[in-house]
């Protein structure tokens, strides 16, 4: 991947770090001069990805979440990575309303939210090894 700037952030999978992570990514994205709506989209998608790591990847145990962000032209690509339990069936997990946490009244909309607010979404996962969520947002009208 070619890029003109990049950042990497590692933090513990604690819920209080979710807002920190989205703020850091939003600050990094600011160099592209996004609209308020574009920044809100990025922050929402990052929040969902980080929350998925905390709740599903590490199942509320402490692990490391890594965020990498890359800028190329008018595009920001964000990777949210955990080394948690992984996803057995990515296609099923990405279906709206699918949740493995019925007892916790989870909405099952995390991936749907990410897809809605970002222009591209890719998920790579290996059960027992972890998950990588790659999201891309084009800033401005040109994709």
Curated annotation (Swiss-Prot):
Catalysed reaction equations from the record: L-seryl-[protein] + ATP = O-phospho-L-seryl-[protein] + ADP + H(+); L-threonyl-[protein] + ATP = O-phospho-L-threonyl-[protein] + ADP + H(+)
Domain of life (superkingdom): Bacteria
Enzyme Commission no: 2.7.11.1
GO term, biological process aspect, one: negative regulation of sporulation resulting in formation of a cellular spore
A Pfam family per the record: HATPase_c_2
Keywords annotated in UniProt: ATP-binding, Kinase, Nucleotide-binding, Serine/threonine-protein kinase, Sporulation, Transferase
Any one GO molecular function term: protein serine/threonine kinase activity
UniProt similarity note: Belongs to the anti-sigma-factor family.
PANTHER family the UniProt entry points to: ANTI-SIGMA-F FACTOR RSBW, ANTI-SIGMA-F FACTOR RSBW-RELATED
Function: Binds to sigma F and blocks its ability to form an RNA polymerase holoenzyme (E-sigma F). Phosphorylates SpoIIAA on a serine residue. This phosphorylation may enable SpoIIAA to act as an anti-anti-sigma factor that counteracts SpoIIAB and thus releases sigma F from inhibition.
Name assigned to this protein: Anti-sigma F factor
Organism in which the protein naturally occurs: Thermoanaerobacter pseudethanolicus (strain ATCC 33223 / 39E) (Clostridium thermohydrosulfuricum)
